[in-house]
Amino acid sequence: MDSEAISSDSHVAAAIATRRRSNSVSDDYSVQRTNDDATQCKYFAIQKGYWKDDFIGRFANSSANVAEARRFPEISMGYWARTAAIEKYVRGFLEEFDGNAQVVSFGCGFDTLFWRLVSSDAKLAKYVEVDFSSVTSKKIRHILKPGGSVDLKKSFESEAVVSHHADLHAGNYHLIGADLRQTSELEQKLATCQLDHDIPTIFIAECVLVYMSSNTSSSLLKNLVSQFRHPAFVNYEQFRTSDAFTRVMEQNLGERGIQLHGLEMCESAEKQEERFRNAGFKSVKVMDMNQIFNQFLDQDEVARIRQIEMLDEMELLEQLLAHYCVVFARV
Ligand SMILES: C[S@@+](CC[C@H](N)C(=O)[O-])C[C@H]1O[C@@H](n2cnc3c(N)ncnc32)[C@H](O)[C@@H]1O
């Protein structure tokens, strides 16, 4: 067979594989793997000194090399800004209610915010993390594995009880395996965490809602407003999605079998506002990551971040930050 035929065959095969993946469980598998990317990028940025996290080393693969494109300073700055912004919103919320408040993290991946809060003596009533069972079971293994210099179990109020390999309950910390798109499965699993529906509760979705259809994420938000008396929501995801930047990103993700089913909600601040207001949230603030970087976050910290790896030009960073946003919504 000549080389052209081989290459066109492999093109066809790749296209068929992508189409198959997009409508099957392997689509979910590819989405779950985005957690590995986020963890490795955060681990890389932390090692560079962008921020301090004593816990991520338990979850990251310290021997894996981060792809060159993910080692650009712009990428590390973006990860720093998103982590810092979410942490600031959550800490502010917990302080506002003197710790008598709960945190629920949807699509938590290997996020370490629970440990960062507890180790800094932040007060909270309950912390619940949710992800696909295949992700939570891995997270549980990392939490419980012996050895290492940091013992994650030390942060728990009581001994960890694991069920079905995918759920862990330990005092005020809970990690549960559930598909956020499956309403009754999610509600059943959340019920095992005995959340108090009457106290203030902040929900986090860091790069998660975009993987679900707009209808599904909208009904998830509506359910929260109807079930919790004082919910707040901090959402980080793509933004300004109708230009070439997003098309290239979509194409790259598509080649890895990842579809962004909820991208239409990320088009503009108006779309985000509409989604949260329709779900019953009364106040909705949308900031793109340039605003987060230059106004919302501590400017001494921003100055320190800028020194770590000096950029020759700001255009790429500004372009990247313009395509992500944080939404903070309250009832
Ligand atoms: C890009 S990763 C982000 C992980 C973490 N929030 C962070 O920012 O480091 C997306 C996460 O959302 C989870 N996720 C996406 N769709 C989900 C669903 N329908 N149900 C449960 N988890 C989901 C994935 O498994 C993955 O862990």
Curated annotation (Swiss-Prot):
Asked if the record carries the keyword Endoplasmic reticulum, the reply is: no
Which keywords accompany this UniProt record?
Methyltransferase, S-adenosyl-L-methionine, Transferase
What positions does the entry give for S-adenosyl-L-methionine binding? R82, G107, D131, D179, L180, E206
Annotated GO biological processes are: methylation; regulation of mitotic cell cycle spindle assembly checkpoint
InterPro entries attached to this UniProt entry: LCMT1, Ppm1/Ppm2/Tcmp, SAM-dependent_MTases_sf
> What GO molecular function terms would the record report?
protein C-terminal leucine carboxyl O-methyltransferase activity
Q: Which SUPFAM superfamilies match?
A: S-adenosyl-L-methionine-dependent methyltransferases
Query: Which superkingdom heads the taxonomic lineage of this protein's source?
Result: Eukaryota
List the record's Gene Ontology CC terms alphabetically: cytosol
**Which Pfam families does the UniProt record give?**
LCM
Q: What does this protein do?
A: Methylates the carboxyl group of the C-terminal leucine residue of protein phosphatase 2A catalytic subunits to form alpha-leucine ester residues.
Name recorded for this polypeptide: Probable leucine carboxyl methyltransferase 1
